[in-house]
Design a protein with these regions (language model features):
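Long amphipathic N-terminal alpha/beta scaffold segment
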Residues: 1-27
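Active-site-proximal loop/helix of nucleotide/amide-processing enzymes and allied scaffolds
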Residues: 3, 21-23, 33, 37-114
């Protein structure tokens, strides 16, 4: 997971979306937003737009954490709910929401939060 995003992993928060078809094959990867070292705004509408334009069936959201703090914040939980609701209207699944740094990651899916 870390390798494709290595250029920004320690410099600033960046949100990426992995777009998948019905067989979970990658259709594409896109940058959703980029922020500062400690702050980033991710818009669920832009994620929905990318999902519709790619005609995907599932998405994985990946957000690097330059600080190394992988504990999900309340804002992460709220964003996950917004994304799930938005995607449900167009029959697209949120397969995972991943916070990661160079050494480790936190997966909402692995932790039963989806």
């Amino acid at each position: 997971l870390v390798s494709p995003f290595k250029d920004t992993i320690e410099h600033h928060i960046s949100t990426k979306i992995i777009l998948l078809n019905g067989s979970n094959r990658v259709l594409g990867v896109s940058t959703v937003s980029e922020g500062t070292l400690s702050y980033n705004i991710t818009d669920a509408r832009f994620i929905l737009q990318l999902a519709i334009l790619s005609n995907c069936k599932g998405v994985i959201i990946c957000i690097n954490q330059p600080s190394g703090d992988l504990e999900p914040a309340k804002l992460d939980d709220e964003l996950v709910e917004q994304i799930k609701i938005a995607l449900s209207y167009v029959d697209v699944d949120l397969l995972d929401y991943i916070l990661y740094c160079e050494e480790d990651y936190y997966s909402y899916s692995d932790n039963g939060k989806l």
